[in-house]
Amino acid sequence: MEALVYTFLLVSTLGIIFFAIFFREPPKILTKKMK
């Protein structure tokens, strides 16, 4: 059960950071990184 909690916290923190960068910077940078 602890593993699920830790994985959930990790995913949530990564998601928050990802969305923060996504909304702060223009999507052009993300497309360039993907290519």
UniProtKB/Swiss-Prot annotation:
TM segment ranges: 3-23
Membrane association type: Single-pass membrane protein
Localization (cell): Plastid, Chloroplast thylakoid membrane
Top-level taxon in the UniProt lineage: Eukaryota
Phylogenetic placement of the source organism: Eukaryota, Viridiplantae, Streptophyta, Embryophyta, Tracheophyta
Protein name (database record): Photosystem II reaction center protein T
Entry keywords, A to Z: Chloroplast, Membrane, Photosynthesis, Photosystem II, Plastid, Thylakoid, Transmembrane, Transmembrane helix
One GO cellular component, as annotated: photosystem II reaction center
Example GO BP: photosynthesis
Complexes and interactors: PSII is composed of 1 copy each of membrane proteins PsbA, PsbB, PsbC, PsbD, PsbE, PsbF, PsbH, PsbI, PsbJ, PsbK, PsbL, PsbM, PsbT, PsbY, PsbZ, Psb30/Ycf12, at least 3 peripheral proteins of the oxygen-evolving complex and a large number of cofactors. It forms dimeric complexes.
Gene: psbT
Native source organism of the sequence: Gossypium hirsutum (Upland cotton)
